[in-house]
Structures are given as C-alpha cells and as structure tokens.
Amino acid sequence: MFEGPEVRTLTRQAEQELVGRRITLSSVSPTRPRFLSVSPDPLAFSEQLTGRTIQRITCTGKSLRTHLDTEAILVIGETGGRFQLHAHSDTLPKKIHWQMALDDGRCLTLTIQMWGFLALMTEEELASHPYLGSDGPDPMDPGFSVEMLEEAIRTRQLEKNDPIKAFLIHGPNIAGIGNGYLQDILFRARLSPKRKLADLTDRDVGRLHEAIVETLSGAVQAGGRDTELDLYGEPGSYVPLLDRRQAGAPCPACGEPIQKTQYLGGACYLCPVCQT
C-alpha cells in the first residue's frame, strides 16, 4: 500500500512530468478487481477525464490529487499496487486496471494489488467526503509539532480510548500512516501496538512524536520503501527496521527474536522486550 512517503514521492515526480499535459484517453479495465472503487461509474469517469488538461498535482496523507482545467480533481487514494509512467503505449504492462494516455504519447497506468480508489470530485465534494475530507495533521510537514500530536491524542481519547495502532493508522487522527511505517514508528518509540491512548505518558508522546518524524522524514528522503515502486518503476531506498523479512530475527536493540502477531486486521512485527 502507498503510504505518505510513497504518495509524496509520486506527487513530486508527477508534478514534474504531467503538469500542462492534456489527457487523450482514459480506460478502466472491465476485469478490474472488485476492490478497486471508481467514481463516477467507469464509463462516465473516463468520459469526464478525456480532453482535460492537468494543472497541478498535490497530495494529502495517502491520496494523490490531480487538479484539472475544470472544477474536477482526480483523486487516487488508499491504493496499493503500481502507478507508473510509460514512454509510449508499446511499453505497457500486460496487467492494467486503469490507463490514461497523454498528448505527448506517454501513458500512465495503475495496477492494483489489494485495493484502490479512483474518483473525480469537486473541491466541495472532496471537503465533505467522510474520509478524504477529514485528514488529520500531516506529520511530513515541517510544522508538525508534539503539541499537535498531543491534541490529536487528547481529542481521540475523549471519543474512544483506542490502542495506539488504531489511532495512528486512522487518517482523521494523523495523515499518511499505514501498517507499513507503523512498525518502525512504534519500535523507535518503544511502544506496543496494543498500548491504550489513556496509558501514554508525556514522555511516551514525546518519543512517539520523534519516532513519527524520524521515520517518515527519512522515508520521504529515500523515496519510499524498498518494497514500493515510484512513477518510473524504481524502488525506494528506505529499508524498514521491522517487516515480514525480520520476523524471528534478533531485535536490533536487544537481540530478542522479533515476533509477528495479527492485530486489528493486519500483521504487527515487534520486540516483546523493547516495546511495552
């Protein structure tokens, strides 16, 4: 899944490559996976895209937003897979779930792994969307402070005393964090994914803030994780401290074997000694 650092990398590259280009074709595969949501329906989606010019590209959290020369915004969000730019149509991969041709002969393709979201929305529709319009503070922005994190935790704790994993991966709390970067953030903060928000001390929150900033800023500089590809099909250079490749390996801090557990719908990798 693309998380904040991958989306920032794709946004930067797409901004350099696509601004000013006119869309000559959009095609959604009839054999797309059922977990790829397209709005409006695929035919209307492609009809409304064709002929439009790309004006600018931005991102928030885990969604990439292409602003067109109409009021429409093309939103690609909560997506896993490959989003790539090709020199011409002869170089397209065999498996494609959506493609978009440009007036210079190049093509963009999206191939979904797991699930994805494509939508054309106005600013008003985007702002009122129950998920996309409610992202919390972006921890990759320079102004993300420990006070902002404290406020987000305090607000969520009043509504529901979540475990820290549930809090971090919920975009309206903190934008851009998914299960991938969660592992390194919690390891650096020395926190168990099951720790409840109400049990966090001021020192815990301070460590958590440092871990979020260190992990995500490092990943942005590295162009994302080494398991994800950028717009040109190149992997990032951020190597996670903890993922499925480290299960059973010695903890880099204490030597205890890294454990894999299933928690809240996904795998967690942690050191049972360092993370409490």
State where each predicted segment sits.
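Gly/Gly-Pro- and Ser/Thr-rich, intrinsically disordered tail segments characteristic of DNA damage-repair
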Residues: M1-M121
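Glycine-centered flexibility motif
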Residues: G4, G51, G61, G80-G81, ...
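Basic, nucleic-acid-binding surfaces and adjacent catalytic neighborhoods in DNA/RNA-processing proteins
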Residues: R22-A44, A152-T276
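Phosphate/anion-contacting hairpin/loop surfaces
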Residues: I73-G176, Y181-R188
